[in-house]
């Protein structure tokens, strides 16, 4: 399977998870082939405010998706993304750069699932605490 064939499957999985690809009449939340100083990311998934949330690195079917791990980490670091998806169209991995190793997934996460994971990791401070007294 070529990388182009893998991308067709990835596009389908993204749409099934509610992501909006370029060419749609709706507000797009996926950027395909975004180029930055680290190179070209195959896909960048955006959060609801339009900021990069997740990188997808696509490999052709005969290669392990994990072969793109360090390449994807470089793109994620350059775009300040915490999440990476690695796929060859057959196998798919999700990687939370803050929590450890990639793990196998059957479907891609939704925008709201990734945003919720991001927010749980970076909770906002909602309470004022009096720290004037010694303990």
Where are the model-predicted features located?
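ATP-dependent helicase/translocase motor core
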Residues: 1-54, 59-135
């Amino acid at each position: 399977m070529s990388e182009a064939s893998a991308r067709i499957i990835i596009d389908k999985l993204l749409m099934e998870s509610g992501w909006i690809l370029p060419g749609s009449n709706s507000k797009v939340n996926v950027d395909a082939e975004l180029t930055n100083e680290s190179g070209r990311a195959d896909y960048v998934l955006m959060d609801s405010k339009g900021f990069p949330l997740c990188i997808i690195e696509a490999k052709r079917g005969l290669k392990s998706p994990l072969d793109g791990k360090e390449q994807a980490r470089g793109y994620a670091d350059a775009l300040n993304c915490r999440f990476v998806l690695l796929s060859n169209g057959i196998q798919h991995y999700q990687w939370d750069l803050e929590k450890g190793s990639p793990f196998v997934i059957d479907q891609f996460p939704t925008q709201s699932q990734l945003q919720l994971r991001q927010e749980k990791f970076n909770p906002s401070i909602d309470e004022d605490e009096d720290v004037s007294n010694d303990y």
